[in-house]
C-alpha cells in the first residue's frame, strides 16, 4: 500500500467521523498548509513503518536462531538431558557436532544428520554383525576423548610453567631494583594516599623502566672541573701551539717526501730512456764499414746548418732593409734603384714570335721574385716549339682538327682594302662630310682675309 493511498484513507475516515464536514473547517482551530511542513497524520504513518520494521527484524532474528547450528545443538542437548542416551546416539551426536563445526552447515544439515542417525539405529536393530563394529567405534571415540583430555592437560601444564617462569623473572628484576626503591622511598612518603589506585602497578612498571634519578649534591668551586684557571688556559694554549708546530713539521716532511719521490721517478724515466737509446744505437743492422755513410751524413748536416744560418741572416737583412726604405721618399728610391723606373725599361729583350705562336703576358704581380723577373715569357712552349710554316697551307690554322679551329690565321694574309667590308661601309659618307667641312672652313677664312684687307685700306 503506497503512502498516497494511506493518506487518502486517513482523510476519508476523518471526514466520516466528522459527519461529512472538512477537517480544516471543523471546530474553532483552523489547520493551514505550509510548504515543507509535516502533517499530523505523518507521525502515525512513521509509527506503522517502524512497527513493520520491528516485525521484520524479529522474523530475521528467529530465522538466524533456527539457522545457527550452535543453538540447534544446545536445544538438542537440553532436550536429551532427561533421556538416557546410548553409546550409538552419543557417537552420532558427536559426529554431527563435528560436521557442523567444520562445515558451518545450516539446519538442513542438522535434519540430515538426525535422519542419518535414525537410519543407523535401524541398521543396528536389523543386523547383529554391525554391533561389533559400532562397539569398536565407540572404543575408538573414548580413546580419542582421552587423548584430547591429555592434550588439554599438557597444554595447561605448559601454560602454568611458563607463567611461573615469568613470575620468577619479575621477582629477580624487583630484587635488582630494590636499592633504587630504597633511595626514592623518602620522597614517596611525602606524597598523599590519593594516588594509590588500581593502576599503581602499571605506573610503577613505567617508572622503573626509566633510568634512575639521583639526588643533586653540592660541589665546591675549587673542586669543580668546569671552571678553568689561568694556568690551565695557558697550558691549553701551549698545547695547541705545540700541536700546530707538530702539524707544520709533519706537512714539511710530507712535502719533502713527495718531492723526493718525484725526483726519483724522473731519474728512473731518464735512465730508462738513455738505456733504450743506447740499445738502439748498439743494435744497427746496416753497419758502416768504410765510413762513407757517416761522411754523407756529415755533409747533409753541414748543408742543413748552412741553410739555416743563411735563412736567418737573410731574414734579418730584409727586415733592416725594409725599415730603411720605408723611411725614404719616392725620389730617393728611384735614384737608388733606377732599374725600377718605367723610363728605364729595356724593350730590346722582347723577341720576335714564331708563326702562330701564343703570346703570354708577364703579369703585374710577383715582380720581386727573381725567377719571374728573369724568365723569358716570349719563349715558345708546348706545340709552339715546332715550326708551323713547314706544314701544308691547310694545316696552318689554330686548333687544327678540333671543334674550335678557326678559318683565319691572322690579318696579315687578308685583304683589308675591300670597299664592301664592314669597316668601309661609311667611308663615302665620312669623306663627303669631311669635304663639306673643309669647304666651309676655307670660305670663312677667305672672308676674314677680305675683311682684313678692307680695314687696312680704310685706315690708310
From Swiss-Prot:
- The protein, known as: Protein MFAP1 homolog
Q: Which organism is it from?
A: Dictyostelium discoideum
The record lists its disulfide bonds as none
What does this gene product do?
Involved in pre-mRNA splicing as a component of the spliceosome.
- Cellular localization per UniProt: Nucleus
Q: What family is reported?
A: Belongs to the MFAP1 family.
Keyword Nucleus listed? The answer is yes
Name of the encoding gene: mfap1
Q: Does the keyword Nucleus apply?
A: yes
Q: Name one GO cellular component term.
A: U2-type spliceosomal complex
Q: Where is the composition biased (Low complexity)?
A: 17-28, 105-114, 434-450
Q: Where is this region: Disordered?
A: 1-291, 411-460
What Pfam families does the database record attribute to this sequence?
Answer: MFAP1 (PF06991)
Renumbered to this chain, the Basic and acidic residues biased-composition regions fall at 1-13, 60-71, 162-184, 219-232, 244-253, 259-276, 411-421, 451-460
Q: Which GO terms describe its biological process?
A: mRNA splicing, via spliceosome
Q: Which InterPro entries match?
A: MFAP1, MFAP1_C
Acidic residues bias: where? 185-208, 277-289
Q: Subunit structure of this entry?
A: Component of the spliceosome B complex.
Q: Which UniProt keywords apply?
A: mRNA processing, mRNA splicing, Nucleus, Spliceosome
Q: Tell me where the signal peptide lies.
A: none
